[in-house]
Structures are given as C-alpha cells and as structure tokens.
C-alpha cells in the first residue's frame, strides 16, 4: 500500500514535571503536576497527520518492553503503519522534562532509538518522508534515497550537520531561529540551499522561503503551559498543507495554528484533535486557510 507520509525518528516515553521553580543543588521539591505520554519528534508529527486522515507510516526502533508495546499499539490504533518499526533488545527511549514557567530542562535516554536504521524498501512506499532528530548518516542516506526516487522530503534538522551538497536535495528544511543563526551566521534565508525553507522565530511566527519568495507568518498569541511538541505540531501543519497543494505560506499558517493548540496543554500529543475541529478553531481565531475558503 502506498503511504502519503512516512516519519523517521525517535520513539520516546515522555515524563514532564511542571514546577514552581527548579530545585537547588541537592534539594528535593514537589512538582506541581506530572504528565506521562508517548513522544518523539517525528512521531508527534505523524500522529497529527494520521488524525487528519493521511495514510502514514513510521521508521524507528523500540525496546522489547511495555513502552515499546505502547508505541506500536498507539500507532495501530490511529491507523499508522508500523511495518518500519524494529523491536530490539534495548530499553525504549525516555525523555524527562522539567518545566518552570518559560524555562525547561530535558534529560534524554536514547536507548532503542540508537538502533534505528533506514529502510529503503519500506521508505519507497511513501510520497513524502519527514525526518526529525536523526543522526547525520541516516539523514544522508534518507535524503539521497528520496532525491533519487522523486520522493519529497522534509527535514527538521535540529543541531545535526548538513553538508551543502545534501542541503540542496532537501525539499523543505525546517529549523528554529537559533539553529539557523548558528548554522548560517544570520537570519538571511538566501544563505540556505534547500529548495524551500521554514524558520520558526523566537518572538513567535515564522520566516518562510518558497523558492525565491520570502514571507513572514505571524504567530498566534496563547498562554503557554508547556511547549513540548510545539515544533512537531508546526511541522505537521506544513506537511499537511504542501501535500494538499497549498502554498508554503498557507501551510505555515496551519502549522502556527497547531503549535498554538499544543502549547496550551501539557504533553506533545495532548492537543491533537481531528481535522474538522482544527477547521472550526481556524474560523474561530479568524485564520484564513484553504480548507475554509469557499
């Protein structure tokens, strides 16, 4: 079966503590709240897209443990093809986050994620590959494969290195402002060789380059409870839009809406809702998107 999108990335178990303040050295404090849930950047993105009715799959690795079983059952429950997920003899990955106001500290145990490998035969079923939180060698293999096969690829690069010759093969490069400035020395979008570029800005909003055309997308004002997964939700909006033939500008607007929903709840996937609900919220906040145009 042909799939619309295959995600490639980590599969983690997220533990999020909300705090009044961070503990001092050797101090023990009580958390104000605790959230436990499934995570992993590309997995969060794919979860949105599956809820939107796209045919999705995933390449990753989990442990032969309860957490690994939870990941597979969750994906199967929302219609994500799990044929690209390996079950290995390593504990599943875990991420622990402490959130105090606008500040956040994260500790990760990669575990089974380190055993993830690219699967060309499985990936060939996709119209579109989305990569996030991957090692450089897997990024290179996947991007080259997609380029040779005519498969569109989006890459949320994070801090991973990206050779210039590989960069030009990426259809949609996604970064935040800090990552972009560290890599290119300024916010000039012309410095990037990717075919299209989306940079989320520190003050909210995003800078979008579609071919040679550059736009700025305004963010939506929200009371931030927890920013975990907001970037992953943004990526989902961009991917959904471009797969449906939208401009990158409109696609980024949808990404902003999904990020807006995400930051108002604790946990990366707590805000996921069906597409019809997203359409309703878009109308409610006055966001003009193609699926609401008559």
UniProtKB/Swiss-Prot annotation:
Temperature dependence: Optimum temperature is 85 degrees Celsius.
pH dependence: High levels of activity within a broad pH range of 5.0-8.0.
Reaction(s) catalysed by this chain's protein: alpha-D-ribose 1-phosphate + ADP = alpha-D-ribose 1,5-bisphosphate + AMP + H(+)
Organism name: Thermococcus kodakarensis (strain ATCC BAA-918 / JCM 12380 / KOD1)
Active-site residue list: 232 (proton acceptor)
EC numbers: 2.7.1.212
Protein purpose: Involved in nucleoside degradation. Catalyzes the ADP-dependent phosphorylation of ribose 1-phosphate (R1P) to ribose 1,5-bisphosphate (R15P). Can also act on deoxyribose 1-phosphate (dR1P), but is most active with R1P. ADP is the most preferred phosphate donor, followed by GDP and UDP.
Presence of keyword Ribosomal protein: no
Protein's name according to its UniProt entry: ADP-dependent ribose-1-phosphate kinase
Pfam families linked: PfkB (PF00294)
GO molecular function: ATP binding; kinase activity
Cofactor note: Can use Mg(2+) and Ca(2+) with equal efficiency in vitro, and to a lesser extent, Co(2+).
Keywords for the protein's UniProt record, in alphabetical order: ATP-binding, Calcium, Kinase, Magnesium, Nucleotide-binding, Transferase
Disruption outcome: Disruption of the gene abolishes the generation of ribose 1,5-bisphosphate.
Membrane-spanning residues: none
Family classification: Belongs to the carbohydrate kinase PfkB family.
CDD domains membership: ribokinase_group_A
Cofactor(s) in the UniProt record: Mg(2+); Ca(2+)
InterPro entries assigned: ADP-R1P_Kinase, Carboh/pur_kinase_PfkB_CS, PfkB_dom, Ribo/fructo_kinase, Ribokinase-like
A biological-process GO annotation: phosphate-containing compound metabolic process
Residues that hold ADP according to the record: 200-205
């Amino acid at each position: 079966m042909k799939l619309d999108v295959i995600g490639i990335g980590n599969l983690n178990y997220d533990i999020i503590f909300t705090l009044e303040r961070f503990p001092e050295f050797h101090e023990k404090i009580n958390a104000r709240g605790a959230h436990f849930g499934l995570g992993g950047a590309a997995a969060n993105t794919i979860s949105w897209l599956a809820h939107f009715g796209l045919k999705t799959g995933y390449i990753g690795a989990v442990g032969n443990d309860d957490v690994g079983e939870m990941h597979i059952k969750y994906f199967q429950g929302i219609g994500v093809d799990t044929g690209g997920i390996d079950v290995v003899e390593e504990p599943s990955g875990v991420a622990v986050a402490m959130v105090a106001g606008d500040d956040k500290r994260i500790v990760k145990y990669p575990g089974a994620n380190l055993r993830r490998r690219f699967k060309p035969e499985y990936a060939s079923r996709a119209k579109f590959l989305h990569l996030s939180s991957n090692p450089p060698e897997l990024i290179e293999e996947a991007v080259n494969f997609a380029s040779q096969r005519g498969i569109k690829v989006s890459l949320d690069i994070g801090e991973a290195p990206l050779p210039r010759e590989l960069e030009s093969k990426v259809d949609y490069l996604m970064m935040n402002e800090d990552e972009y400035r560290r890599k290119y020395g300024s916010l000039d979008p012309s410095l990037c060789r990717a075919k299209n570029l989306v940079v989320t800005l520190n003050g909210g909003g995003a800078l979008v380059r579609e071919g040679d055309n550059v736009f700025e997308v305004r963010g939506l004002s929200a009371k931030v409870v927890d920013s975990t997964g907001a970037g992953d939700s943004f990526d989902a909006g961009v991917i959904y839009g471009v797969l449906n033939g939208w401009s990158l500008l409109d696609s980024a607007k949808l990404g902003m809406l999904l990020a807006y929903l995400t930051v108002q709840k604790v946990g990366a996937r707590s805000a996921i809702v069906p597409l019809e609900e997203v359409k309703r919220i878009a109308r409610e906040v006055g966001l003009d998107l193609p699926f609401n145009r008559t």
